[in-house]
Curated annotation (Swiss-Prot):
InterPro entries: Questin_oxidase-like
Enzyme Commission number(s): 1.-.-.-
UniProt pathway: Secondary metabolite biosynthesis
Functional description taken from the UniProt entry: Baeyer-Villiger monooxygenase; part of the gene cluster that mediates the biosynthesis of the tetrahydroxanthone dimer neosartorin, which exhibits antibacterial activity. The two different monomeric units appear to be synthesized by the same set of enzymes, among which the Baeyer-Villiger monooxygenase nsrF is the key enzyme for the divergence of the biosynthetic routes. The pathway begins with the synthesis of atrochrysone thioester by the polyketide synthase nsrB.
Protein name: Baeyer-Villiger monooxygenase nsrF
Gene: nsrF
PANTHER family reported in the protein's UniProt record: BAEYER-VILLIGER OXIDASE MDPL, PROTEIN, PUTATIVE (AFU_ORTHOLOGUE AFUA_5G03330)-RELATED
Length: 433
């Protein structure tokens, strides 16, 4: 069918109000009607009424208006009760209810995103401690989402991040956090540099082999925490951060450096360079510990706790990837390919010109931030910072060079860097003639 396309003017004729309509059983959620209004307007502006000659009718508005979800007011209204809140946590199907709840919390008179995050993550109540642990679930995605909301001052993203944390299915990391914190609190273990703890994980047959490929997506829950819980708790509890500004900043840099080390250090000789998809998130999420570390409304004790928990979970993820050998020369001696001759500015521009679902750009930005915040500590603490100086950019180049030629996520990364069979899926390295 040949048509002449004329851009339709935007008209304000698609605002729904949550009024009773024919055949309605329950009231509609205001959030649902707002979302439907937006979708109807987008359909009006972008999509034709006919998408093929025969029976090609646009049914999008019909579907939107017929399938409006009902308001779950009884659930949302009761969530201020910690027992009710906790009852609905860790259930993916409760995300919408938690989102509506946190939106309401943020819209309360005199409320703010800082006050809501403080109440539900940093008030040291049993519920807040559980919510704080949930921020680290799902390969750090809730804290990444929340971090963006705080960094860019977007309450809507804060609500989404909190709702994601509350509803995310569990890997049981809350039990791990509490056990490691309790053991560290006994004073029976001396504090050690994080780089030494990575080496402890690598040296432990129990930890290195706890996760199995057959665990699928549950290598943390069923592998490391399921088969080597006491061992990983004993190692992780040795990373301890004092509640003073200097130690929190130093420990944050230490965490960033070791996370980057776990990404740039592993390599299988004879294979193309690849960064591990899972360990990459340890770096990507690290930037938000700068964001949270600079938040004046978070106490220094809570900032220390945040960094402790992040570094301890990074150790778990390192073990979940079979604790690969980390060799400094794999990034210090790296010869760039596509990024040869680039600086940070040129690399940023290059990132905007190729196919990326956001993972590479977030990883590179986190490395740039780490380079900046690490600089004041690199001379005094060089021995505990495996990545420093030019190495931050080298690892960013590895990431860009190894992903830019691929559009499929499966080909951009190695999916379990310490497991030999996963390297079988990576092409052999071919020397250019």
């Amino acid at each position: 069918m040949t048509t002449t396309t004329i851009e339709a003017p935007a008209i304000a004729g698609f605002h729904l109000s949550p009024e009773k309509v024919l055949g309605q059983v329950e009231p509609y959620s205001p959030g649902a009607t707002d979302a439907a209004s937006t979708l109807l307007q987008q359909n009006h502006e972008k999509w034709h009424m006919y998408f093929r000659d025969v029976a090609g009718h646009n049914h999008i508005p019909h579907a939107i208006l017929t399938a409006l979800p009902p308001m779950e007011a009884p659930t949302v209204g009761k969530m201020r009760d910690p027992a009710v809140f906790r009852q609905h946590m860790q259930r993916l199907d409760q995300y919408s209810n938690f989102l509506a709840f946190f939106e309401q919390e943020l819209e309360q008179p005199g409320s703010s995103k800082e006050a809501v995050v403080s109440r539900y993550c940093f008030s040291r109540t049993p519920l807040a401690d559980f919510m704080l642990a949930q921020l680290f679930e799902g390969l750090y995605h809730p804290i990444i989402h929340l971090g963006f909301g705080i960094e860019f001052h977007l309450p809507g993203l804060v609500a989404e991040g909190l709702a994601q944390a509350a509803s995310h299915d569990p890997m049981k990391i809350d039990v791990f956090f509490q056990a490691a914190e309790a053991l560290a609190g006994t004073g029976s273990l001396a504090s050690k540099p994080l780089v030494e703890l990575y080496r402890q994980v690598r040296a432990s047959d129990t930890l290195r082999t706890a996760a199995r490929l057959s665990d699928g997506p549950w290598k943390v829950r069923d592998g490391v925490l399921g088969r080597a819980f006491d061992e990983i708790v004993n190692v992780a509890a040795q990373f301890q951060v004092s509640s003073n500004e200097h130690d929190v900043q130093r420990a944050t840099v230490e965490m960033m450096s070791c996370a980057a080390w776990a990404c740039g250090g592993p390599h299988r000789p004879g294979k193309e360079r690849k960064i591990d998809f899972f360990l990459m998130h340890c770096v990507t999420s690290s930037i938000f510990f700068t964001v949270l570390g600079r938040a004046t409304w978070i106490s220094i004790a809570d900032k220390a706790r945040l960094v402790e928990w992040k570094a301890r979970l990074d150790l778990v993820w390192y073990a979940a990837c079979a604790a690969p050998e980390l060799r400094d020369e794999n990034f210090l001696n790296y010869e760039p390919t596509l990024s040869r001759g680039m600086d940070w500015r040129q690399l940023y521009h290059a990132l905007n010109r190729y196919h990326d679902d956001g993972h590479v750009a977030k990883f590179v930005r986190a490395l740039k931030n780490a380079e900046e915040v690490a600089l004041p500590f690199e001379q005094e603490h060089a021995d505990i910072l495996p990545v420093k100086g030019d190495a931050w950019f080298r690892i960013a180049q590895i990431c860009y060079d190894s992903t830019a030629s691929h559009t499929e996520a499966q080909k951009k990364w190695v999916w379990g860097v310490g497991f030999a069979p996963m390297w079988d899926l990576v092409p052999d390295f071919v020397t250019s003639s």
